[in-house]
Amino acid sequence: MARENAQAVPSGALWERDAELAAVSAAVDGLCEGHDTGGLLVFTGEAGIGKTAVLGEVERVAAGRCTVWTARGGETVTSVPFHVVRQLLQPALVSLGPVEAREYLGDWYEIAGPALGIAQPGGRQVDPQGVVDGLVAAVSRLVMLHWPLILVIDDAHWADQESLRWLAAFAERLDDLPVLLVVAHRDGEATGDSARHLETVGRAARPGTSLATLTAFTPAATAGLTRATLGEGADDPFCREVWAVTGGNPYETVELLAKVRAAGMEPVESTAGALRELNAKARGRGLVATLEGLGTDATKLAWSAAVLGTNITLRLAAELTGLGTEDAAHGARLLREARILTGGDDALEFVHPLIATAVYQSVPAAARTALHGQAAWAVTRSGRSAAEASRHLLEVHPDDDPEIVDQLRRAAREHLAVGAPEAAYRCLERALAEPPLPETHATVLYELGCAALLTSPNGTVAHLRAALAMDGLEPGTRTDAVCRLSQALVHLGHVSEAVQTIGREAARLEPGPDRMRLQAVHYMWEGIHTGEADALERSRVLREIAQPLTGRDNSERALLILRAFDAMTRGENAELVVELCDRALVNGRLAPGLGWTDTEWSFELLIMLGGSYLFADRLDRAEALFAEALRIYEISGWSGGHLAIAHAFVGYVHRRRGRLVEAEGYLRESLRLADRVGEELPMHWDAACMLIDTLLCRGHLGRAQEIADRYHFGPPYPSILILPDAQSVRGRLLLAQGRTKEAIDELESASHAAAETDRYNTVLAPWQHLLARAVAPRDPRRAAELAADARRQAERFGTDTAIGEALRCAAALETGQRATSLLARAVAYLESSPCAYEHAEARVAYGIAARDAGELTRGLTLARACGADTLAARARDVLREGRGWG
């Protein structure tokens, strides 16, 4: 890597950098002394301010003591996914064979390997967040193997998005790793996501010690450097003019002094007037004029190098310009002498990024486009991938070339396979501009919509709608496009529109597999839509459709799952719910093509399957399903929204089983993962609702309210169904806080919603139990009616949990022996239920009501085992103090 002050005064750009050099020395010393935690140095500042020189000092101080790996962003390669992280790890990766690489990376080999270029990608699109996590894990392993290790990244403002995403995640892990990370970037150059990632890195550094903004030289430092370079005879007026001309910019100062020395100028006041003109030759139009003065061959060679940007060899640059070997060598020599290029013939680079930028911008538009086109073909001819050629194809002017469209589509598939959907999106957008042939235009739009699904649901909607408005999609592809469009609409909160979109497409198809798939998706979105117009009619039609189905294919299995979920939410017989779910499985397992990572069917369908088992007291099957989801998503590197949802439902299975501490852990992790994906997403509602419910069971009201505040848990609610019922959970929170009037309003609203949708499952949505207790003091008749209705619905559903909870609710409205008798029956049911927390609640209440210390002690033991702290404390206090007996 070239240094800014190469061939000048080696320490020139390091004047007035004592604080930064001290931080470098201390950080390297700390690493070598074996500190368990990592270090981070971030240097920022304008172009030419000396950041690269400081990074060079890191290498000098570490020489002979540490392993140092370096990488550098490039202005012309920002579109190349994982360019910087591959460059950074190249010393470790280049020597690894496939077997060694697999051993080094372990379980992350299949996920991180393709992104690093050391493993072949699989055939499917991978989750970008999973790839980032895989890279963090992979680099963490390499850190342990190569300690003491220093990672140096220069010009991070030009790093590709994928590498920056990794860098931000890795910087947040440094407290756990013995590695020194050193990053340099310009102030204000990065925008959008790049700026956000660099801000994350900056936040991980400590201002004043490991985060430093470099400033320009003072006049005194400029004078000192001038005399060190040109001799003590440099007079004060000359030194002041050097500072005035360069503004104290270290790079410009060093370059200007080198030119003064090369020109043989006397550093005295009489020659100072020539400094401004001399300085202009090193930048902007002056640099271009200098380049043109070297001749046509040297100019074209510099243009080619600027277009290539990285991995520049004299042979490749000459090939792009059509120069012979001797002419190319002569041009390279001239460019080195003019301090434009540096390095050997196999590793040419520009002396400074400012020069590279100026040269690239000086290339006439037509010539630049032609050079990018030639570079793309050169990359392709060399046997490298379409993805590698794509950065050049992106710069070629559209010209109705079907071959370029095909290359860009291949590149997009390669980008998706390594976890770079943004890069794939850029390729397909450019392919669309070519434009494609009429017969493939709709397909390119479809591919563009699919590429945007994980990163831009709005883009997915626009592109898929455009694709569906055109001819050219195969029938199966068209059906898939409609399903993906509806999924994007749901993720954007437009559930009603998703339902209508599916319905219109299904109506135009003849009976067959595609139509049945659309029907299933239609009912799936209706099933989670809280604002559907005629829920009773939908349930009736779904019941009729599902009745004769045996589960012979995945469309039938999907309809059986939807029917089971509908029956569960409406509180129909739980045995029927379980029987329908079982019919949707193949030998007790998910059918091929209907797995957690299969794309034909949305994973929401499997959430419905697991949720149906969960609320029908078949926690064993729900746990197996969601644990499988968690395992598969982790193995596959799907660590975005899918993994967040899996953690949420694994956590809620623990909640239903009464493992409240474990449940809280999973649910907090779910929210952490969801926060990485975005804000106020449907997954946040589910996970927050489940966590608040769990914390209420534990008796941690303050923590529950913290979650409610952080995730804005309250009205207005989203238009999709939340599991468990959000209004019931919020009503319970309000009651626990003594905010009875607000709780009644919330629970009355839940009552109206249930009446509109005919969803009466007292386990999923126990609003009747809660409302009965809330209104009992002022309206005991209404409370009794609510409790009686809840009991009838619970007996209709038929699970031990539902009936036991209904009996416990009824007991809360009674006194004396009647209450004790009802609690005894509740305990009998809940003892047979898999829900240990509800059993503990009933057992404690029964022990207190019956004044039975043995029963209360059993309740205390159960409460402790569940992690229900407040319930356990209540039982313990009654046993210890003898107060509070029924």
Residue locations for each model-derived region?
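Extended alpha-helical scaffolding segments used for macromolecular assembly and cargo binding
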Residues: 40, 54-58, 330-331, 347-350, ...
